[in-house]
């Protein structure tokens, strides 16, 4: 399974090489506070890509590295294989630590954009994130579910920025024994 994941990362990430820009019309948040963003986030909705296809219970965990970069651990449950998949990466700020514009690598020198374009500034409970173009979109939250108003805000804002919100996938977070046993594991 790790070989398959490595192959997928090898095939996908080169396509993102040099894709550390921001999609037209999308501005990263300013006044960003990385210490408040660290920790576990649940993927609520996304535009689908091969590297996440078929995954449920998807989470991302962000922590500071000794070198000042951010450690990223993405996890998801592969429904068809009945197994957990995990990828570890590194994120670096593009415009300084107070701007939600980062580049993320899960494979060597190849980086893709990670643009936080909307954020719950009061409590850091949700974030709207884009990649290098409008085919990459995520709604992340601190809890496995969010109020419908947040989802509606996400859809409205994303649609106004050119994302195809009709293709959103809403990620299942369940309470299967496997999910409970693995979801609580924070590294």
Each predicted region: which residue ranges?
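A beta-rich soluble binding module of mature secreted/lumenal proteins
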Residues: 19-187
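Bacterial N-terminal signal peptides
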Residues: 7-15
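Positively charged n-region of N-terminal signal peptides that target proteins for export
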Residues: 1-5
